Amino acid sequence: MTSDDTVRPGRPRSIETLAELTPEQTDAVLALLTEAARTDGQHAVSEQGRLQLRGPAREGVVHLLLTLDGGELVGYAQLEGTDPVEPPAAELVVHPSHRGQGHGRALGSALLAASGKRLRIWAHGGHSAARHLAQVLGLSLFRELRQLRRPLTGLDLPEPRLPEGVSVRTFVPGQDDAAWLAVNAAAFAHHPEQGSLTQRDLDDRKAEPWFDPAGFFLAERDGELIGFHWTKVHAEERLGEVYVLGIRPDTQGGGLGKALTTIGLRHLEGQGLPTAMLYVDADNKAAVAVYERLGFVTHETDLMYRTET
C-alpha cells in the first residue's frame, strides 16, 4: 500500500472493479507498479499479486483500476478473498505523480465496500503515508512481516548435518510438483498465503525468468519428501533469497530446517551474490531466533492492517 493521503484538488476520477484484466490493462498496471517501485524503493504489490495480474480470472481475486477523465490509470488495488478464516487481503498503489489528491483514500474506501468492511491491507516497507491512510480508514495494525538480510561474502557456516536417513537433491519440474505442493500445504497449514498454493501458482513461478531448479532443494527420507528449501536470485539487485523453506510437520525438530537453510545459503554464495534475504513474521519468535543465530538482521518491515473484528 503506497499513497500520500494529504488531499489536494484533482481531476475527476472513476474506479472500475474487474475479475480479469485485458493484456493492455495488465501492461498499464505493471508500468504503474514499476514507476511506484522506482520512487518508493520497494514494490507496493507482492510477487503473488503481480503474478495474479496475468491470465484468466482467479477465484476470489478482483482488480480495482482508478482512472482519471480521459482514461489515465493512476491507481490500482487488488483484493484477494481466498482465506477461509481471515478477511480479504488487499494491496494498493497510487502513481507517484498523482499522490496527495485523495486517490489512495478512494481506493481504500472502494476496498472496504468490496470486502463488506472486512479487510486486511498491506503497507510494504511500512511507508509512512500508507500508515496514515490505514489510520484514516479505521484499520488497526495486525501483522509485522520482517525482511532479514545477512552478507554472504565470507560465509562461515558449519557443515550441514542432515538427520539420519535423510538425503537432499534438487527439484525436477513435473516429476516433483504434486509431492511439493502436498508438503508445502502441510508445512504452511497455519499460513494460507503460502500453504494454499496450487499447481497454477507453481506453474506461474516456474515460468518466471528467475526460476532455477538447481537452487530448489528437496529433502527425502525413504523416498518421501519431508522438507525443502527453495532459493531465489534477484539478478538486478544481486540478492539471494531464502524464498520458501518448509518441513513436513511430523518430521520437525530434528535439525533439518537448519541444515536446509545452510545448504541454500551456500548455494547462493556460490552464485557470487553478496547478500541473502528472507521474510519471517515478527511474532514467530523461534524462527526469528534461528535466523538471527545464522547472522540475519532486520532490514525492513512490511505491515498489515485490518478492520476491527
UniProtKB/Swiss-Prot annotation:
Task: Give the superkingdom in one word.
Answer: Bacteria
Catalytic reaction annotation? 1D-myo-inositol 2-(L-cysteinylamino)-2-deoxy-alpha-D-glucopyranoside + acetyl-CoA = mycothiol + CoA + H(+)
The record's EC number reads 2.3.1.189
Q: Which GO terms describe its biological process?
A: mycothiol biosynthetic process
Q: Which residues bind 1D-myo-inositol 2-(L-cysteinylamino)-2-deoxy-alpha-D-glucopyranoside?
A: E47, E193, K232, E241, Y279
One GO molecular-function entry: protein-N-terminal-alanine acetyltransferase activity
Positions annotated to bind acetyl-CoA 1: L92, V93, V94
The record's induction entry says: Gradually induced by thiol-oxidant diamide, under (probably indirect) control of SigR.
NCBIfam families, alphabetized: mycothiol_MshD
Q: Which HAMAP family match?
A: MshD
Subunit info? Monomer.
Q: Which family does it belong to?
A: Belongs to the acetyltransferase family. MshD subfamily.
Its annotated function is as follows: Catalyzes the transfer of acetyl from acetyl-CoA to desacetylmycothiol (Cys-GlcN-Ins) to form mycothiol.
Protein name per its UniProtKB record: Mycothiol acetyltransferase
State the organism of origin. Streptomyces coelicolor (strain ATCC BAA-471 / A3(2) / M145)
Q: Which gene encodes it?
A: mshD
